[in-house]
Amino acid sequence: MPADKVDVSYKKLDDNHSAVNGSATRKQIEITFSHNGIERKALLLMYLPNHVKTKVPVFLHFNFQGNQTVSSDPDIIPSQYSDRPRGNQASRWPVEKIIDAGYGLATIHYFDFFPDSKDRYAESILALFGHPSEGDIPADGGQAIAAWAWG
């Protein structure tokens, strides 16, 4: 990935202190990446335990079907690139168990960094670095896996 500086801004969209039956604070944060006159947005979903009053370790993991799939919580903002049903991956995301153990959980839909489809390359984070199409990538440039790692 290029060493170019990318401007990053954050906008808190949600800060609910009674999520997960009152045991967690749910935050939803829109992250905006800007460079070369181009912007890309990612939506971070985070749960933090309410019973721990100090900083906590947080599991950070991409999700593959959209933020709304990790829980049946009706207030999770759906991912922009996913129409998957709310909660359909909840069995793979032990949110309550993680919170009860005193950890946090943060997730972002991987499509927010690189939609996993060649015809949507221009929508990826790589466009910020002057690579609007797959044909514009230098020989040592990254593609999907590099974009996900960068994210």
Annotated model-derived regions:
Residues V6-V8, V20, V52, V56-V58, ...:
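Extended aliphatic helical segments
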Residues D14-A19, T54, Q68, H131-E134:
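A generic structural micro-environment signature
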Residues E39-K41, K53-T54, S71, I108:
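Short secondary-structure capping/junction motifs at helix and strand boundaries
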Residues M1-N50:
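Non-catalytic accessory segments flanking enzyme active sites
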Residues K27, A42, V56-V58, A101-G104:
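Generic beta-strand structural signal
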Residues H61-G151:
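Cap/lid segment of the alpha/beta-hydrolase catalytic domain
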Residues L43-Y47, T54-Q65:
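Short beta-strand element of the alpha/beta-hydrolase
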